[in-house]
Amino acid sequence: MFTARIARSMASESAPAASSVAPGSSGAPMADCVLEVRGVGKSFPGVVALDGVQFRVRRGTVHALMGENGAGKSTLMKIIAGVYTPDQGEILINGEPVVLNGPLDALDRGIAMIHQELNLMPYMTVAENIWIRREPKNRFGLIDHAELRRRTAALFERLSIDIDPETDVRTLTVASRQMVEIAKAVSFDSDVLIMDEPTSALTDKEVTHLFRIIRQLREQGKGIVYITHKMNELFEIADEFSVFRDGKYIGTHASSDVTRDDIIRMMVGREITQMFPKEEVPIGDVVLSVKDLCVDGVFRDVSFELRAGEILGVAGLVGSGRSNVAEALFGVVPATSGEIRIDGKPVRISTPAQAMKHGMAFLTEDRKDSGCFLNLDLLANMEAAVLSRRYVKFNFVQQAQLKRDCEEMSRMLRVKSPGLHEEIQNLSGGNQQKVLIGRWLLTQPRILILDEPTRGIDVGAKAEIHRLVSALAGKGVAVLMISSEMPEVLGMSDRVMVMHEGRMTGIVDRKDADQVRIMDLASR
């Protein structure tokens, strides 16, 4: 079976023996702690999310929170932000025990959180989103829109944010929405600011801007909790960090006292010797050929070939048109001109259904908005792409076989969940991503398009997904992989296609590809 062959290929790279770093302590004086968590536990049906953890944040510091997906980071932050109620333990603010009765209570007590999944109202303006429920009123009790604009403009000037306060949020890019979320959190003048993967959709320039804001807040004495999977960010912005693993507190250290390998060992409980396990496999015949592909006003004249067993990386800055090309290939946004050939034969792809009939699969970059059915369980999410194909005979769904294959896929991908009937919204981001990958692998694709396959995923899960992608290529699947992470592009690709402002600026062979050359092509 397809999944069994892939599983054997992945298993051939066995994990090395576990090692650990002794947990440390920041040694923060009690009077210096703006926020402290003691012995907090939280369980969900079939899952212990937090097991008696501790955590401290000092004034005027950036405290990074590290751990694999499912380690308990987001659960702890939701408890601190008043979204969840802990089953046990206590929370102290400025040394005083408190009970948080919801997110508004947490805000009133000086705790603001920027969620990884943005929570803005799309049909309201930027200013209205920032000051919602706090709008200035005129003498008639109506919203004072002039004062609303003035407050927003003053806030943006302080944070050096160049966004029109009158713009509807729905018209903004994901990166701009992220900056609005950050400004909204800052507007509460909270003592504690929690940032959950704040750079996931930002360009390098925008990340630099965000770090300037964070340093400014740190100088004002704010305590900042910074959740990230990116090691370079930890060393650049964090004063200290804590690691969680499988719902347990592992330790706290000063960022200057450890190496990248130390942190990885703390996070995963083992060594990860090969982050980019690219197999050398025979490259087969051309499966997908694209010539002069265009979507008016978005990108133009994109041409390339993709062969069986090949991983073609796609690099470029945010806004370069990478994701738009993927959407055109899969029929999400039909191309306005150009030619697509599969196995040398011209094909017309104007809908995802047509793309799937030609053996294509597409993992989108935004798993929340266009990937997951959040209110449905794992089984429903995993089977969504195959119900009309392999498992329907004589107009009846072969439920037993489908469930067996979904269970096998879940085991192969090491999805951490109580079972197939758990709602996918209760899973960590990394496990949600694995479910979506499993959805498309069940279709047995010949051409697999991956758009940011490891965004927001911890280092251990990244290595697993890299092994999976390499194993798929080894079985002859043609892979088109879009990524904003340069090490991932360079480490996994046989060739790298580079885009800039809607144009393809070059294709570089693996042996000739390096960061300088790719960035040069990406900025032409």
UniProtKB/Swiss-Prot annotation:
Gene3D superfamilies: P-loop containing nucleotide triphosphate hydrolases. Its main location: membrane. ATP binds at residues 67-74. GO terms for molecular function: ABC-type D-ribose transporter activity; ATP binding; ATP hydrolysis activity. GO terms for cellular component: plasma membrane. The keyword Membrane applies. Transmembrane segments: none annotated. Residues 35-271, 281-520 form the ABC transporter domain. It is a peripheral membrane protein. It is an enzyme of class 7 (translocase). It holds the Pfam family ABC_tran. Coiled coil: none annotated. It catalyses: D-ribose(out) + ATP + H2O = D-ribose(in) + ADP + phosphate + H(+); D-galactose(out) + ATP + H2O = D-galactose(in) + ADP + phosphate + H(+). SUPFAM superfamilies: P-loop containing nucleoside triphosphate hydrolases. Its EC number is 7.5.2.11, 7.5.2.7. Keywords: ATP-binding, Cell inner membrane, Cell membrane, Membrane, Nucleotide-binding, Repeat, Sugar transport, Translocase, Transport. It is found in: Cell inner membrane. Part of an ABC transporter complex involved in carbohydrate import. Could be involved in ribose, galactose and/or methyl galactoside import. Responsible for energy coupling to the transport system. Belongs to the ABC transporter superfamily. Carbohydrate importer 2 (CUT2) (TC 3.A.1.2) family. This is Putative ribose/galactose/methyl galactoside import ATP-binding protein 1. The lineage of its organism: Bacteria, Pseudomonadati, Pseudomonadota, Betaproteobacteria, Burkholderiales.
